[in-house]
């Protein structure tokens, strides 16, 4: 098999390989799939689960939560699915999820972030922008702390990510800056401190600064 060019291709290839793989037996016996879904159909369900759990900040979730998610997915897409079948296929056949007692989670946090990116790509621009902006504003560290999600998002839908996340962030900063009064207010609002140091080699002064956290977010 060819080596993927980026992590997004790796996760995509890993999913299709695991979902369609055969047991390591000479007879080539294929793993049982209880939900009887095509790879694309099952990928879409995982994307919806990833979308819902990621943006709700849930790494672990119980069967009731998953049942609610699958019920909503079925209503939206005119599907009839059993949660038990999805859990079995996700944990035993595709190995995309782990079950520990009554708790479920993606087999790796990066898989959850990848499927969340796939899921949000399936939304229209208005809803996608609403979710992404709310997520970025809820915690200023969200963007820098979820590199897999951001990398997948830019790989899957670069232009839409600029449109629905980057530009709104810039517009928000511009609006806040315009609402500020004189230069004194702008300095006190944006800068934590200024740092003056001397470059002994060139015998000159250098001026640096630290941005306040709420402003640094827009440049991180």
Segment roles from a protein language model:
Residues 50, 117-220:
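Hydrophobic repeat-domain scaffold segments
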């Amino acid at each position: 098999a060819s080596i993927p060019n980026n992590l997004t291709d790796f996760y995509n290839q890993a999913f299709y390989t695991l979902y369609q793989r055969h047991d390591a037996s000479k007879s080539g016996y294929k793993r049982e799939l209880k939900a009887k879904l095509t790879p694309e159909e099952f990928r879409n369900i995982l994307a919806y689960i990833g979308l819902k759990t990621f943006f709700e900040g849930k790494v672990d979730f119980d069967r009731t939560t998953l049942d609610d998610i699958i019920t909503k997915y079925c209503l939206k897409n005119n599907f009839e699915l059993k949660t038990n079948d999805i859990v079995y296929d996700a944990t035993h056949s595709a190995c995309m999820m782990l079950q520990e007692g009554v708790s479920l989670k993606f087999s790796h946090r990066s898989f959850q972030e990848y499927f969340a990116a796939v899921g949000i790509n399936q939304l229209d621009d208005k809803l996608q922008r609403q979710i992404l902006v709310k997520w970025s504003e809820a915690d200023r560290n969200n963007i820098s702390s979820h590199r897999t999600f951001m990398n997948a998002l830019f790989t899957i839908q670069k232009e839409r990510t600029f449109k629905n996340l980057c530009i709104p962030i810039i517009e928000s900063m511009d609006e806040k800056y315009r609402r500020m009064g004189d230069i004194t207010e702008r300095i006190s609002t944006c800068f934590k401190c200024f740092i003056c140091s001397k470059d002994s080699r060139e015998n000159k002064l250098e001026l640096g600064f630290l941005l306040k956290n709420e402003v640094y977010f827009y440049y991180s």
